[in-house]
Amino acid sequence: MGILGASGYGGAELLRLLKAHPEVELVGFSSRKYEGRPLEAAWPQLWDGRLFAAQEEVLERAEVVFLALPNGLSMEIAPEALKAGKRVVDLSGDFRLPPEVYEAWYRIPHKSPDLYREAVYGLPELHREELKGARLVANPGCYVTAATLALAPLAAEGVLKGAFVVGLSGVSGAGREAEGTAFAEVNENLKPYKAGGTHRHIPEMERNLGRILAQGRRVRTHGEARAVRLSFTPHLVPMTRGILVTAEAEVEGAWSQESLEALYRDFYAGEPFVRVLKGLPETKATLGSNRVDVRPLYEERTGRVLVFAALDNLVKGMAGQAVQNLNLMLGLPEETALPKEGLWP
């Protein structure tokens, strides 16, 4: 295994998880900023005597490459890696959306549009069979994972008409650069950002739910999708990590708390990393784990359906999900090296 972009938060979590993986060998990791320096220079919590290698060296040695790079870079590197016989798990947004949609929302010209048709969307709960043997995986982001898993049972039932989604994220979701996330600016502060339908994860959420509406429980990345619209407003919260999503779903038909819970428990029965709660989820219970905690709630007074979902943005929302995808790609037990229990307190 090799990691490009190992000096970002997602790269650090990949390092932590892959170093403990009993079935794979981490042969190298790169960072332009830390090349030639010891791992501990970037990550004092990790214990490893190796140095950050050159990107070219990692690409040459690794059989599977994780791209934990800024948007726009993976589309340049993935073709080279695939041509050399490597398999790729991309943590950026480069292969999650059709090229024309990507360009409209990310404002980056797509340099490898043909590869999008080969990429498999990396949400195992919905794409498990597709991921087995995949060469290129487009790993979803944290908000999208939480929102999709919160609403997927309603979409699969064919009753989802739309949703209003509010997301709350710890500051690590913004990456390692301190602009806008410095302690003095986020401490004792809560603020929305990219409101008014401008967040670039919106088309990914809509595409996911549209595929489920059209295809049902098990979906194909490039299969049929129905139109669905949702509103999404993210907020930055003064905590290090964690995502909490509250989705108010517009649904068809008559519902009760009992029927709603039964739908969710049936949909997620047997899923190793999704827990349907009786109470309300909280981010702290998921930290360090690859688990998503979900709670559907029928509001009898108004007849509304609310769904809450919590996860660790750096694990199930990023690196843990990437390792889950790796396990499926290689035919390994899906839960290998992935913690279900969180850290507490």
Curated annotation (Swiss-Prot):
Assigned protein family: Belongs to the NAGSA dehydrogenase family. Type 1 subfamily.
Broad EC category: oxidoreductase
Record key words, sorted: Amino-acid biosynthesis, Arginine biosynthesis, Cytoplasm, NADP, Oxidoreductase
This protein's pathway: Amino-acid biosynthesis; L-arginine biosynthesis; N(2)-acetyl-L-ornithine from L-glutamate: step 3/4
InterPro entries: AGPR_AS, AGPR_type-1, NAD(P)-bd_dom_sf, NAGSA_dehydrogenase, Semialdehyde_DH_NAD-bd
Function of the molecule: Catalyzes the NADPH-dependent reduction of N-acetyl-5-glutamyl phosphate to yield N-acetyl-L-glutamate 5-semialdehyde.
Higher taxonomy: Bacteria, Thermotogati, Deinococcota, Deinococci, Thermales
GO cellular component, one term: cytoplasm
Predominant location category: cytoplasm
Protein name: N-acetyl-gamma-glutamyl-phosphate reductase
Gene Ontology biological process terms from the UniProt entry: L-arginine biosynthetic process
Keyword Ion transport on entry: no
Keyword Metal-binding: no
SMART domains for the chain: Semialdhyde_dh
UniProt catalytic activity: N-acetyl-L-glutamate 5-semialdehyde + phosphate + NADP(+) = N-acetyl-L-glutamyl 5-phosphate + NADPH + H(+)
Organism: Thermus thermophilus (strain ATCC BAA-163 / DSM 7039 / HB27)
A GO term for molecular function: NAD binding
Enzyme Commission numbers on file: 1.2.1.38
Domain of life where this protein originates: Bacteria
Subcellular localization: Cytoplasm
Annotated active site: 142
